[in-house]
Amino acid sequence: MIDGDGFRPNVGIVICNRDGQVLWAKRYGQHSWQFPQGGVDDGETPEQAMYRELYEEIGLKPEDVTIMATSRNWLKYRLPKRLVRWDSSPVCIGQKQKWFLLQLDPGRESRIQFGCHGHPEFDDWRWVSFWYPVRQVVSFKREVYRRVMTEFAPLAMPVPVVQVNRKDGRRNRSR
């Protein structure tokens, strides 16, 4: 399903842990890494598509995660001309994405597996610092990643703990 402007509706998934790290997945047989993502099928809501893609690509089920946020807007990126399939109809020139921030529930990391539905999209994964993907993703997705991570940062980043040790309740200051 491609809209009138040539963009395919898609969902993007940022999975974080309690330390503010995000799941970064390596595309099958390639050297490129990205967040899980996938198309929205006809008749499907973005949330339904997210859960389907989450299971198909990462092997996680709704009970393994908690939705922390959804992007306010659909975010678009254009494909480089060399990746556009000009012989298809309609022509898809890019993706418009609704993003989801999920927190992996405690003790569920062992459930991550690839290829739960056909050919796997990914063959490796790791936890990376929150902002790492913005610098590392393929260049044509970089602006979308910057925007979504900026929107999700207040919810995903752990709040620093300030230790109070003094009897008067003020913070210790080290010089």
From Swiss-Prot:
GO molecular function terms noted in the UniProt entry: mRNA 5'-diphosphatase activity
One cellular component (GO) term of this entry: cytoplasm
Short motif Nudix box, span: 38-59
Keyword Iron: no
GO biological process per UniProt: mRNA catabolic process
Cofactor: a divalent metal cation
Domain named Nudix hydrolase: residues: 6-150
Matching InterPro entries: Nudix_hydrolase, NUDIX_hydrolase-like_dom_sf, NUDIX_hydrolase_CS, NUDIX_hydrolase_dom, RppH
Keyword entries, A-Z: Hydrolase
Tagged with keyword Aminoacyl-tRNA synthetase: no
EC number assigned by the record: 3.6.1.-
Domain of life: Bacteria
Family: Belongs to the Nudix hydrolase family. RppH subfamily.
Protein purpose: Accelerates the degradation of transcripts by removing pyrophosphate from the 5'-end of triphosphorylated RNA, leading to a more labile monophosphorylated state that can stimulate subsequent ribonuclease cleavage.
Protein name as catalogued: RNA pyrophosphohydrolase
Organism this protein belongs to: Aeromonas salmonicida (strain A449)
